[in-house]
Every structure is written in structure tokens, then in C-alpha cells.
């Protein structure tokens, strides 16, 4: 293998995101698809990962055992569900493998497990791996510092009918970026649902609204509304390949890291702007 390459393993190989990640790994220079995983009992076990993803023969067979492929990858990429990701995290921590985590919906204990593991292995953990979304998060911080103290802030997100968590991880990251810029904790100012007689809007809160419909890949808007004007900052994704390419870019970036917890803004160098 060329010195510049990094070998990746893809979790959830048969899922929508897993297939995109396989395609991206096979296409991206400097990346080698080393392993592809599916759950025990899946009808996809034994398939060629590249053919499964519609990218042509890869020579990588879909398996269910991480132990069987532990010598075939350097970085594990996981966009599955929290319980599965935490199992994979424990394995990677034990075997010194880097991780790129795009799974959302973790509770506080899950997030703490990721923080603890990052003391021993390098992890990029992000709610969204799109370059555009991460630029948007930086813009939200700037807007919040100028307008946040006097405007009503609302975050609206829309995703496909199959998404199982709400609000989306990206919407929560948007809220955290805004709250952080205002020296607040999102837990203290978030309003996640409104129904019935709610009374007037409480000043200083950050509202969230969620749409689940059709095949929407991902749309996010933050609204800063005052009397007579409002500013809206929006990102719309039209292809999951945007997220897949960002995840592979993160895996390449991790090549020089031994441990630590990072996000996509670190990968892109946005914190220096």
C-alpha cells in the first residue's frame, strides 16, 4: 500500500449512507477500502462491497465480524445508530483504530464514552460532514454575536421519512453554535416543540421545528427575526455524497493524529477564521 493511503472500514455497508461511503472510498485518491461491515444475519453478508454500492468490484467482502477484519483498516467510519456505534467504539479503542463518527442521537452517556475513548484514539465526531454546513456553523456564530441578543432565533430542519431522531444532529449543532456565541448552554434555552396554548414567546430562547417527509436529504435554516426584518441562513443538501466525501476527508486528516476528539471544523481549519 502506498504510504499516503489510509485504509478505511465502513459500518452499515448496505444502508443508504454506507453505500455512499463505499463509493466515495473507492473513488477518493489516497483512500483504500479495507473492510465493509453489516449486522449479523444480514442477507448482504458475503457480497462484494463495491458491487453492493454500485461502484464495481472491490474485492472487499461484506462481513459481520470486526475481529475478522481488524488488520484490514486504520480508520473506522460509522454512520449507523448509537448502540452499534458504541460497540464499534469499544473495539476501536481496544485495538488503537481511529474513528470517524457521523452517527447522531447519542445521549449524554454515549457522548461521554466518545470523549473518554478519545483520550486513547483519534476521533472525528461531527453532526454533519458537509463543508457547506460547517461553514454555515461559523456564520451562525458571527450572526449570533451581532443579532442574537435582540432577535428571536428559530431553527427549522427537514429530512426524509426514514430519519429516526429529531431534531437532527445538525440542527442541534446549529443551536449549540448559536448558544455558545451568546455564552449560553443550549439545554437552558432550547424549545423543542410547541402545541396548544403556549403563551407568548419567551425572550432569549432558541426554537426548533422538525419536518419529516419524502426523500429530503437534509435542509436546515436558522432564522434571526426582529421587528421589521429577519435574517435567514440556509443550507440544502441534494446528495449524501457530500457527507461521504467529508467523512473520507476526515479519515485522511486523522492519519497524523494519535488521539484526541475533533470535529469537521478542525478538519477544515475553520476555527482559525
Curated annotation (Swiss-Prot):
Its EC number is 1.17.1.8. Keywords: Amino-acid biosynthesis, Cytoplasm, Diaminopimelate biosynthesis, Lysine biosynthesis, NAD, NADP, Oxidoreductase. The keyword ATP-binding does not apply. It comes from the Bacteria. HAMAP family: DapB. It holds the Pfam family DapB_N. Homotetramer. One of its GO terms (cellular component) is cytosol. NADP(+) binds at residue 39. NAD(+) binds at residues 12-17, 38, 102-104, 126-129. Catalyzes the conversion of 4-hydroxy-tetrahydrodipicolinate (HTPA) to tetrahydrodipicolinate. This is 4-hydroxy-tetrahydrodipicolinate reductase.
Amino acid at each position: 500500500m502506498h504510504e499516503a493511503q489510509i485504509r478505511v472500514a465502513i459500518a452499515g455497508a448496505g444502508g443508504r449512507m454506507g453505500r455512499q461511503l463505499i463509493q466515495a472510498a473507492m473513488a477518493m485518491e489516497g483512500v483504500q477500502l479495507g473492510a465493509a461491515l453489516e449486522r449479523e444475519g444480514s442477507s448482504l453478508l458475503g457480497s462484494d462491497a463495491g458491487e453492493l454500492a454500485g461502484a464495481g468490484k472491490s474485492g472487499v467482502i461484506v462481513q459481520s465480524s470486526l475481529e475478522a477484519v481488524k488488520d484490514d483498516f486504520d480508520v473506522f467510519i460509522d454512520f449507523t445508530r448509537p448502540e452499534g456505534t458504541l460497540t464499534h467504539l469499544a473495539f476501536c479503542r481496544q485495538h488503537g483504530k481511529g474513528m470517524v463518527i457521523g452517527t447522531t442521537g447519542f445521549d449524554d452517556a454515549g457522548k461521554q464514552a466518545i470523549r473518554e475513548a478519545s483520550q486513547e484514539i483519534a476521533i472525528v465526531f461531527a453532526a454533519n460532514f458537509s463543508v457547506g454546513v460547517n461553514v454555515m456553523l461559523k456564520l451562525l456564530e458571527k450572526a449570533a454575536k451581532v443579532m442574537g441578543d435582540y432577535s428571536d432565533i428559530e431553527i427549522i430542519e427537514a429530512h426524509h421519512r426514514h430519519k429516526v431522531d429529531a431534531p437532527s444532529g445538525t440542527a442541534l449543532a446549529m443551536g449549540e453554535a448559536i448558544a455558545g456565541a451568546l455564552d449560553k448552554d443550549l439545554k437552558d434555552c432550547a424549545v423543542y416543540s410547541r402545541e396548544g396554548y403556549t403563551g407568548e414567546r419567551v425572550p432569549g430562547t432558541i426554537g426548533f421545528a422538525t419536518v419529516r417527509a419524502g426523500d429530503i436529504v437534509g435542509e436546515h435554516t436558522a432564522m434571526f427575526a426582529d421587528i421589521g426584518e429577519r435574517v435567514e441562513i440556509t443550507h440544502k443538501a441534494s446528495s449524501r455524497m457530500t457527507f461521504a466525501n467529508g467523512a473520507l476527508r476526515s479519515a485522511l486528516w486523522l492519519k497524523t493524529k494519535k488521539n484526541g476528539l475533533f470535529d469537521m471544523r478542525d478538519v477544515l481549519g475553520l476555527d482559525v477564521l
